[in-house]
Amino acid sequence: MAEKLEVYKCELCGNIVEVLHGGAGELVCCGKPMNLLNENTVDAAKEKHVPVIEKTNDGIIVKVGSVAHPMEEKHFIQWIELIANGKAYRQHLSPGDKPEACFPLITGPLKVREYCNLHGLWSSEG
């Protein structure tokens, strides 16, 4: 059963999907079940993957890692997502970009997720 906002990946073709409405069915791609991506479970440098949330007067800045994450062709952050108050905001990144994103100022509890093409899904709350 897929739950709202879960992220799944096809290990054959690399498709990644986020569930917008949960349901009882199984997510399938390339004829095989997709894998649920669990946050913060890959054995990798946490200081380069756990998102850091910075609140400013102008908005929210999310930086990937307390030490900047590489943004190279073979190893980079594909996207950063902010979830708050029933809304999801996402910034897609490319190699060469800074590993950060700016979002509008939002009050209340925040959850931030990012996806590293080599080390998977990471999150933090603030």
Curated annotation (Swiss-Prot):
Binding-site list for Fe cation 1: C10, C13, C29, C30
Binding site residues for Fe cation 2: H49, H69, H75, C116, H119
Record Gene3D superfamilies: Desulphoferrodoxin, N-terminal domain, SOR catalytic domain
Organism: Syntrophotalea carbinolica (strain DSM 2380 / NBRC 103641 / GraBd1) (Pelobacter carbinolicus)
Family the UniProt entry places it in: Belongs to the desulfoferrodoxin family.
This protein's name: Desulfoferrodoxin
Function description: Catalyzes the one-electron reduction of superoxide anion radical to hydrogen peroxide at a nonheme ferrous iron center. Plays a fundamental role in case of oxidative stress via its superoxide detoxification activity.
The protein's Enzyme Commission number: 1.15.1.2
Catalytic activity of the protein: reduced [rubredoxin] + superoxide + 2 H(+) = oxidized [rubredoxin] + H2O2
GO BP terms: removal of superoxide radicals
CDD domains in alphabetical order: DSRD, SORL_Dfx_classI
Subunit architecture: Homodimer.
Keywords assigned: Detoxification, Electron transport, Iron, Metal-binding, Oxidoreductase, Transport
